[in-house]
Amino acid sequence: MKKLFTMLTMAMMALTFTSCEDEYIADTLEGTWTGNMYISSEWDGRYYDATSTEVTFLRDPFTYTSGTGYWVDYYSNAPWDYVANHIDWNVSNGVIRVYFCEEGTRIEIRSFRLNHNRFVGTIYDSGNLVDFELYNVSRPYSYWDDYRWGYDSWYDDYYYWARTRSGDADSTKVIEKPKRVVRPALK
């Protein structure tokens, strides 16, 4: 009986000391972040570097450590203005995993520092590593952000790829969408 009591006590202590770190990370991550993810896109044999990135993490209220959102990379010298994706994300054992729904690709974010204002870390994509730095621009449920100001049509056309901007583009030509890549910084 004493052995059973000892085992139950050990089990209860283990449950008591279980970390809630993943829930804390997901809670802090929720919101819209902007900055530079140092992401590139390959298209037609050329690489184009994103000038900035905006990521919105929306937390699932029933699972606490996962959710959906949007990831938009903006470009200035590419045949398109931006590449937008829906994302599914989760936090497990301190690692943030992001799945790009339209592209069918995944990345991991590890070795990061995160607070309510700044998100700095490393993206892992098939052996490629790149550091990033994002800043929080909006957070749901904040006392100063309780209203939606105006109308924003950005959410109405997130499924579509930007058309080419060149004037001589053939409108009947099917344009292949760019492929997101993570390239290590050139030294």
PLM region spans:
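Positively charged n-region of N-terminal signal peptides that target proteins for export
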Residues: M1-L4, K187
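Sec-dependent signal peptide hydrophobic core
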Residues: F5-M12
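C-terminal motif of bacterial Sec signal peptides marking the signal peptidase cleavage site
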Residues: L15-S19
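N-terminal helix-cap/turn-to-beta initiation motif at the start of protein domains
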Residues: C20-T34
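Transition segment at domain starts
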Residues: T32-Y38, W43-S52
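Generic short beta-strand segments
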Residues: T34-S41, S66-Y74, T122-S126
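N-terminal glycine/threonine-rich, aromatic-flanked beta-hairpin/loop signature
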Residues: R46-V95, K179
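Beta-sheet ligand-binding and adhesion/scaffold domains
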Residues: V95-K187
